[in-house]
Amino acid sequence: MITGIVVKNMNGYFYVQDDTGTIHECKVRGRLKKGRYSLLVGDRVTISEDGFVESIHGRHNSMVRPAVANIDQVVLVVAAHEPDINELLLNKMLVMIEHADIPIVLCINKCDLMDSDTEAMVELYKSIGYDVLMTSTYDMTGIEDLRHVLQHKVTAFAGPSGVGKSSLLNAVD
């Protein structure tokens, strides 16, 4: 038996990274599909040599959106502009993550496009205690700071479509 962490879920296959860094393509046995918990990215699991998830280890946290477990922090990404910040959606996501008791880093991407209204909003979130990181993949502002925030932590990226989550991940890679 091999233990590892689920790093990807795609088309019914779960990709499990073992302690040596090897990725195993796995399926879930029927009895686990009918169980109390569905398998999430971040779950620590035991897998068989023939590529089946045999058991799911305990979780210390989990979220529904994004569907992840056992994470150290969430980087919640919004864009300063294009698309404009939807404050209602941002606040809903903050509440959801806070409810899961997971530390949050609020990342304002595309900061090179920031206007005074967005600056005032950023100051408000800072004043109530959120860690705020300003980034831009256009001029690479804050990318080193983001690398530092990610170091030695299991992190989920969340945020609306088009805010630059993938661009940020590519920039820190």
Where are these regions (language model features)?
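Short secondary-structure boundary/capping elements
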Residues: R59, I85-L89, D117, Y138
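Conserved beta-strand/loop subsegment of P-loop NTPase cores
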Residues: D72-V77, H99-C111, Y130-S136
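Canonical P-loop GTPase G-domain recognition
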Residues: K110-V163
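A conserved segment at the C-terminal end of the G1
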Residues: K165-D173
